Amino acid sequence: MNSIILAAGYATRLYPLTLDMAKPLLKVAGKPMIEWVLDNLANFPGVETIYVVTNDKFTSDFQRWADHYQFRQSQLTFKIINDGSKSDADKLGAIGDINFVITRENLSESDLLIVAGDNLFSQSLAGFVEYAKKTEATVAAYDVGDLEKIKRYGNITVDSDGVITRFEEKPEKPQSTLAAIALYYYSTEVISLVTTYLAAGNNPDQPGRFVQWLYTRKPVKTFLIKGKWLDIGSKETLEEADKIFRKLAVK
């Protein structure tokens, strides 16, 4: 199994903080937020290589960071991938980036664990990985607990087996408080469909769009994430994450 960390966006909503620094390299509780993600992955046996896909603007920054981080997590194997984009206007999009890495690194024969570099989890993801490895496709789900709040996310409903039965991005009339979040496991059977999805002219941005397309073609399982999940999309959530993870670091 290999892993892809999505870190190629330009985070325009966080300007000016992200004008000269990639969002996943912004500090949360004293360290780059991407390290919170990777420290979590460091506990999983069987992850061969972690591919961090970024853009041309920030590739050198990520490479410098990776060179230093590698000393502290020597058991992890990293590769920084430049998707070639130079601005928000010519970005490949998250699904485009996934396909770019799969194609360039010949990963079609490997199961993939995919996570956004700006999604933070307060608890271990080991349970997700163990569960997901027994499926063709699994997406992490989080109960936001509020019908108004869920309108900002990809909203799902599931059956008694945890299989997605409905998926709607930012619904006006949500039918549950479950959000599909940017943590995915795809087996080799599913990875081959990423190219099919893009070739049909579907939206290359927002990784949840692929799940929305996939669940009508294959059973997509869900795994409910416990603890705290934060999608860093604004200065407010960045500040909230800093407070939460400072408390966690003290424990």
Predicted regions and their residues:
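N-terminal nucleotide-binding beta1-loop-alpha1 segment
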Residues: 1-20, 25-26, 77-78, 219
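Conserved N-terminal catalytic core of the sugar/cofactor nucleotidyltransferase
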Residues: 2-5, 13, 31-115
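Active-site metal-binding loops of divalent metal-dependent hydrolases
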Residues: 10, 118-119
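A structural signal for short hydrophobic beta-strand segments in well-ordered beta-sheet cores
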Residues: 25, 156-158, 222
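Short alpha-helix within the catalytic core of nucleotide-sugar-dependent glycosyltransferases
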Residues: 38-39, 63, 122-133, 191
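A short, conserved beta-strand element in the Rossmann-like catalytic core
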Residues: 119-122, 229
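Conserved donor-nucleotide/metal-binding helix-loop-beta segment in metal-dependent transferases, i.e.
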Residues: 123-150
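Catalytic-core segments of class I nucleotidyltransferases/pyrophosphorylases
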Residues: 129-130, 160-231, 235-251
